[in-house]
Amino acid sequence: MTTQFFGKTLSGPFTIPSGIVTTATSIIQYVFDHMPEVGVVTTKSIGLKPRLGNREPVLSQYAPGCFVNAVGLTNPGAEESVALLGQLRVPHDRFLLTSIFGGSLEEFVEVAKLLAPVSDGLELNLSCPHATGYGMAMGQDPEMVRAITAAVKAVVDIPVIPKLTPNTPNIAEIARAAAEGGADALCAINTLGPGYTSAHGHPVLSNGAGGMSGKGVLPIALKCVREVIAATGLPVIGCGGASSAADVRAFFDAGASVVGVGSALVGMTTADMQAYFNTLQLDLDHTQDRAENLVRYDIDMQFRPVSLVSNQRVCDDIAILTFDRKINVQAGEFIFLWIPGLGEKPFSALTDDPFSLVVIDLGEFTHTLMDLPVGTEAYVRGPHGVPVEPPDDARIMAVAGGTGLAAVYQIARDFGNADIFVGARSENRLYFLDECAQIADLHVATDDGSSGFHGRVTELLRERLSNMSDTERSALVFYNCGPEPMVHAAEAVQREFCKPEQIFSAIDY
């Protein structure tokens, strides 16, 4: 099948709805380069000014494949987005649909004028259900929808595609208003709701409520697409609950020109997504229905209570928090720690039994953790990520700085035959050294020479590598985690002696 969309013959009939995966230009470029089935790439919604959005948690699962979210329109602002989107290499058979929002008609116009030159089309977010004063608040008023659409059309020369809310008694009336304003196409639907989820007596989302998406909204999405097309005859991007080839066929049967797949991607790696979209396209081509078997309906987003038993201060801005039980997290995986009313952040577990983690004071959440009282009940969800699997005959070299030791300690502990390199500015910022020495050959460096080698940990690493034979170096696998400059410096040294495929890194932000 071929998909024609505003003068382009698309490489595929799918899009990923705004705000789900394609939230950064690096990811957008990856989709352009590796996922041809996604013919329309939709950006996250962009406003006039930078916006932080809501504190985590921003996503909750209330049933397998069914979610509520309240991200809160997080974005870097229009001017920064112009620079970022302008760097993209958009293939001739793809369509870059830039989603925009505003708090007024005038803001929509200003954002549209800025972003149109770096876009193939503009999606007007008139349907976000969880950001007060934006989106749905405007999209439920036909006159406002008509006026905003007309005002944007008057200042740009690319297609304008309003995204409609299902949270209205008559979506056909809203669709007709958009068409009267000059809309070139429509997108239906955005999330339902807002809805509410709770865990252990607390609202999960920091916003309290959020838009509902996933399998549960499919029947409403299909109904809305049919009503919108019947009312306007415009091309429609159909979104809401599609996860299988049967769902996609239902959207096409309803009249959709392009189909959005979003919630079905939750929990997938980029490689998983490539395989999923490839299978979904093959299903359509050969009247099969296998792609849904790749959807992660097994994702566990439940929170488990843990109680703080120790808060050990390492120095002014580093602490080790130890909790009262074991959690099942393997080397290379991470968890989310949630404290109701404060927020949620991802952490590598320093140890799994008992569960402990390392905190560095970088923001409101971690600042509060520094003095978290013993006895505090918190909640953990996960693990997430992919466990590491070094080759059986590998010699592990773990390089850590800051709180990065938490990401690599379990690798050395669980697989053995390891060196651990730990770097810090000074001795008072070092921690967990005795435990490291019990499981690996330990190498310590401090910038001021107050402990171990006097200098950068990468200098110590280079010395160790230079004293090894080619055969020994060929068996090495490196795991780096720490501040970005340290990680990049470690990678540079490692590439002097070993192949890039032997190196695995994570930046500790």
Give the positions of each predicted feature.
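Ferredoxin-reductase
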Residues: D300-Y379
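N-terminal capping/small domains of soluble enzymes
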Residues: M1-L96, G102-G103, Y276
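Catalytic cores of alpha/beta
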Residues: T25-D33, E106-P117, T168-G181, V225, ...
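C-terminal helical cap(s) of enzyme catalytic domains, especially alpha/beta-barrels
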Residues: H34, G53-P64, T197-G210, F252-D253, ...
